């Protein structure tokens, strides 16, 4: 039990209807802005000195950006993810081409969908890339950078690409 189906969960229907209606209304613009931000972020990271994958193909055609932080299977991606987390930035350690060990990958997988959802644009992607560089390239104390991360985020509290967005504070706590 419950196997593949536990019940109808009718209380989920209303939320799904609203989410799908919002996606129908705003999904195209949201997807466009995510890709534009991901490409701007990748370009800004490369300008800061990061090894961003797929430069010859425009870095990305999705919400994801991949960066390499050391030799294959070196664990540099794991270390980078932990340092960024200490600075209040959540990323995803990720195996990259050539890596063979899931627990010691060389890369990070970075997404911009949440940053886009709260209204950040291409200019903010440059600011975020600078925060990454301070931690990972310039070895600045993550606890110092964390204050600047919180300050940047404090200007972006409203959920976008949804109905009644002027009244939706996504981060009240």
Where do the language-model regions lie?
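Short, well-ordered loop/turn and helix-capping segments at boundaries between secondary-structure elements
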Residues: 2, 22, 71, 86-90, ...
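Active-site C-terminal subdomain of aminotransferase-like
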Residues: 1-72, 145, 152
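Proline-rich low-complexity regions
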Residues: 2, 96-97, 157
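Short alpha-helical basic/polar micro-motif
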Residues: 32, 82, 126
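Conserved strand-to-helix beginnings and helix N-cap segments that scaffold or border functional pockets
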Residues: 28-31, 78, 122
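PLP-dependent enzyme catalytic core of the Aspartate aminotransferase-like
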Residues: 36, 102-173
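Generic non-transmembrane alpha-helical segments
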Residues: 40, 44-48, 79-87, 135-138
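Conserved PLP-binding catalytic core of the aspartate aminotransferase-like
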Residues: 52-119, 167-173
